Amino acid sequence: MESVDFMAVDEQFHDDLDLWSLSLVDDYKKHGLGVDCYVLEPVVDRKIFDRFLLEPICDPVDVLYDYFRIHRDNIDQYIVDRLFAYITYKDIISALVSKNYMEDIFSIIIKNCNSVQDLLLYYLSNAYVEIDIVDLMVDHGAVIYKIECLNAYFRGICKKESSVVEFILNCGIPDENDVKLDLYKIIQYTRGFLVDEPTVLEIYKLCIPYIEDINQLDAGGRTLLYRAIYAGYIDLVSWLLENGANVNAVMSNGYTCLDVAVDRGSVIARREAHLKILEILLREPLSIDCIKLAILNNTIENHDVIKLCIKYFMMVDYSLCNVYASSLFDYIIDCKQELEYIRQMKIHNTTMYELIYNRDKNKHASHILHRYSKHPVLTQCITKGFKIYTEVTEQVTKALNRRALIDEIINNVSTDDNLLSKLPLEIRDLIVSQAVI
């Protein structure tokens, strides 16, 4: 019987406590106050706190921050856990980025985060990254796995910095799992989110030791070269080609880099850049199959693009341009005539065509043109005035101008009584030519 009385008293006590806590919460609400004010009380009662949580919470990170600030020596983990249920990684990152909080208090918040590692990856993907914030997370247990963190960083659409990539590579450790570097993601978005080309190129140069295969197809079935062409990044395209990118690679959809270069050359936006890229690709050793595929896949009507293709396709096989004969017959004839003329002009046991357009022989073109700058064939090139294969005229003109500058310098030096003027002409020519770019 006595036990029943004690139970009744206990129930009455809890009922009174419930009424009191409810009254307290109501009193707070009447004055427009909420849980954000309650956590400033010297003692935060769990039951009263839970009643406050029946209403939506605004800025839960602020509430948690204030709780830690007031109760840092008397923290109730129950209160912390209940608040964290309302806090997202986005909330924490937003608060971190704002830098409106004391670092020591915010360190406590990060320590109580479910996964500091996931918080780091979220930050890399969803914010403009600052190295000091990354350091703060590392101090609280996050690990910088090189490839995993780079992929998270490239995945985001915020501004990118090569300094962040360098930091990750220098301070990170090898990944525990076999993770592939998703370098393509940095330029896969629409134009508004693309990183500027100089920064992209810097990042690619930093990451090249971690690229297992520069011609590997990414998750979207494209190569890095394909992505760079689509983005219209001239220097990046050239750099990728210099580092082994295969211009004849076929994408998962059956298209090639030449296909996308031809297609992008027809767009209005950044037209000059895309035409320049198209010409860079056309100068590469394209396979017959790649060229035929580009002709088959592209039914463009842009004459600037078509003429550029004809100019270089004619170097491979005249018959490749038969498909364009109806609309650009005269241009094709002009190309053929200029090519035949260039292929007949010989200097130093090689033709002008090989000297200018052959990848192996044109490495020494400037030296040969300088050496034979007074050869009548070079004068013929200037007189002929090629309208399509203008590179011949440009290279020869550059060589002749360089020759004239060197001769002028030698003549000026020879008028003075100095050691250089006493040397044989051939030696003087060699010395001055090394100094003149």
UniProtKB/Swiss-Prot annotation:
Domain of life: Viruses
PROSITE patterns: ANK_REP_REGION, ANK_REPEAT
UniProt keyword list: ANK repeat, Repeat
Secretion signal, residue range per the UniProt entry: none
InterPro entries per the UniProt record, alphabetical: Ank_repeat_dom-contain_49 (IPR051637), Ankyrin_rpt (IPR002110), Ankyrin_rpt-contain_sf (IPR036770), PRANC_domain (IPR018272)
Pfam family name, one: PRANC
ANK repeat ranges, renumbered to this chain: 117-146, 220-249, 253-290
Coiled coil: none
Its biological purpose: May be involved in virus-host protein interaction through the ankyrin repeats.
PANTHER family in UniProt: CYCLIN-DEPENDENT KINASE INHIBITOR 2C-RELATED, POLY [ADP-RIBOSE] POLYMERASE TANKYRASE
Family: Belongs to the orthopoxvirus OPG015 family.
Protein name (record): Ankyrin repeat domain-containing protein OPG015
Organism: Monkeypox virus
This protein's encoding gene: OPG015
